[in-house]
UniProtKB/Swiss-Prot annotation:
Enzyme Commission number(s): 5.1.3.4
Gene: ulaF
Name this polypeptide is given: L-ribulose-5-phosphate 4-epimerase UlaF
Binding-site residues, substrate: G26, N27, S43, G44, S72, S73
Family label: Belongs to the aldolase class II family. AraD/FucA subfamily.
Amino acid sequence: MQKLKQQVFEANMDLPRYGLVTFTWGNVSAIDRERGLVVIKPSGVAYETMKAADMVVVDMSGKVVEGEYRPSSDTATHLELYRRYPSLGGIVHTHSTHATAWAQAGLAIPALGTTHADYFFGDIPCTRGLSEEEVQGEYELNTGKVIIETLGDAEPLHTPGIVVYQHGPFAWGKDAHDAVHNAVVMEEVAKMAWIARSINPQLNHIDSYLMNKHFMRKHGPNAYYGQK
């Protein structure tokens, strides 16, 4: 697990590097599917002092199997998503400013241009709010459940992120680094959408044919963007 712990540590350290977190407001995890184990950031440990050895390993029930610290308080959310979506290899949660603003407003981040379409096939959805019973019960688990309720059976890697109403963004990817990459993009397109709608409140969504072209040339079966 040392290699995965190093990967998760590096991905967590990318959060402050890319301006996605303030203090300890974020976490990254990755899963070893063969072993059924997840590596995640320890709860409340400052990035300035954190080391790869501090990463916490949990099983799919959330039991700590390796590590001196308690795992992130959002661990149950991560585990619920891993259980539901086998294509996920890494998950990120932050409170990045612009994506969180859309979450607090209770609005999906609209797909307005090609930057968005290069990564997200459609709007980045916003979940419903959790009920008082859901919050007072198993809050973090229920956060995962409301994300799954919103995504349904859609391929999560086609829309690799979501904003949880009144909470903040979650992003995911093939591994921890890919998840962070998608979290960075989500924050950028959230900012772009806010600015664009401020300039033109009547702005429509990107044309579907342009969205299809940009997404499929990077992610479709005949993708040709980048190098092989």
